[in-house]
Amino acid sequence: AGRLRPLSLSENAMRRVCFLLKVRSERLEAYRRVHEEVWPEMLEALSRHGWKNYSLFLRDDGLLVGYVETPDWDAALAGMAGEPVNARWQAAMKDYFESLEGVNPDEAMRPLDQVFHLA
């Protein structure tokens, strides 16, 4: 009782992925507005490539927390990389973020290590 089980994924499990980005302080309201009307073709592409339960959370200081569930994170990223709508979306989003070091926002998403999960 009270012991934690190690984290593992079964063959059919969805992987929970969380990442952090930083939105520029002067772009916070514009970032919020653009996400009120994400392009339908972008939403369709995300769904087609296994992005499920995808959420973004934005703190007032610009910290953006992204969360998504997918069976295969690498395949989900690769699938979106081949979508023309994603190239357009990433180009449109690029100037909203700090510290991208010359890459698109989707290339700067580095998954955090999950250390606990209560199902």
Residue ranges and their predicted role:
Residues 43-65, 69-71:
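Short, glycine- and small/hydrophobic-rich beta-strand elements in well-ordered beta-sheets
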Residues 1-13:
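N-terminal amphipathic/basic-hydrophobic helices that include classical n-h-c signal peptides
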Residues 14-16, 61:
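A general secondary-structure signal for short beta-strands and their flanking turns/coil
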Residues 49, 70-108:
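An amphipathic, aromatic/His-enriched active-site/gating alpha helix that lines ligand/cofactor pockets
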Residues 27-52:
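Short amphipathic alpha-helical segments
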